[in-house]
Structures are given as structure tokens and as C-alpha cells.
Amino acid sequence: MSMKGKETMSDERIVVGKFGSTYGIRGWLKVFSYTDNAESLFDYSPWYVNQKGEWVEFKVESWKRHNKGMVAKLEGLDVREDAHLLTNLEIAIDPAVLPELSEDEFYWRELFGMQVVTTNGYDLGVVTDMLETGSNDVLVVKANLKDAFGQKERLIPFLEEQVIIKVDREAQRIEVDWDPGF
């Protein structure tokens, strides 16, 4: 394989998109973005692709809108056959390239693994996922095995001040105003 990507050592990456099929004969690929603003995917550089358990670094040489999607040309991929090897692989970035947020803003990944506790001190469980519903984001909380209400999972709306009382990054804890019976 004549890929000119650079192998990297760190394993911490954030998936921000996925490659689709090849486009043309000069190494272009369709790109699907998982970011809120699809084009912001191109603000983050370099990109990393996990190939056979190794993170390989790529730089975007060029990109453009195509129909209702986007296509990208990566440095070192000059023929369709090389680009085809990235089809359906995820695009990841180094967390360090993300903009810093204010004290009251959070990336979803920061909330994963945090303990969720009611204002009365009841331990609801641990955040395992987030859902985007359109009206508001929702915490997916895996309940403790000894949950008094028999819950295995809870969906808690991420409504600041109404439901989410406090997010403590240092203590890895989210305080919520939520009935444990739900």
C-alpha cells in the first residue's frame, strides 16, 4: 500500500466523521461529518484513521461540496485504488485541536462516565451515552445494579437549571433535579 500517512502513538482520538466511497480517479473520497456544522470537520487537522489497530495521520489537501455532501482529497492519496482503502473508515481527530470551552460548556465525551446524583443524594447511575433529540440533548444513564426502583437505564433531559443543577468536572459528578422513579 502506498499510503503516505504518518503513524502516531497516542490512542485517544475523537471520531468526527466517516469516509464514503471514492469520487473520481485522483484519490478523492466522499466524507460524512458527525459535527454539528458539517463543514467544521475541515477546521480540525490532522485527521486520523485507524487501520489495522494503528492510527495513521492524514492531512486534507483540498475539499469541496458535491451535490448535498462533501468530498475531500488527502495528501498522499493520488489514485482511486489507494483512496478506496479508506472507504467506510471513521475519521478521528486529536482532542487537543478542539476549541476550549467556557466553564459552563461541555463536550459530550466529558460527561461519559460521570456519576449522576439527585439533589436528595440518590445515586442514579453513570452516564453511558448522549442522545440528540432536536429539542434538547438527553443523558443516557446506566442505573446501579441495586437500584431501588428496578431501573436499568434512565433517560434524563439535559436541561440546564431545570433538570441539570450542577456539573462538577473535578468530582466527575452531575447533580440533577429528577425523580428516581422515572
From Swiss-Prot:
Residues 103-182 form the PRC barrel domain. GO terms for biological process: ribosomal small subunit biogenesis; rRNA processing. It holds the Pfam family PRC. Gene3D superfamilies: PRC-barrel domain (2.30.30.240), RimM (2.40.30.60). Belongs to the RimM family. The PRC barrel domain binds ribosomal protein uS19. NCBIfam families: 16S_RimM. Binds ribosomal protein uS19. This is Ribosome maturation factor RimM. The gene is rimM.
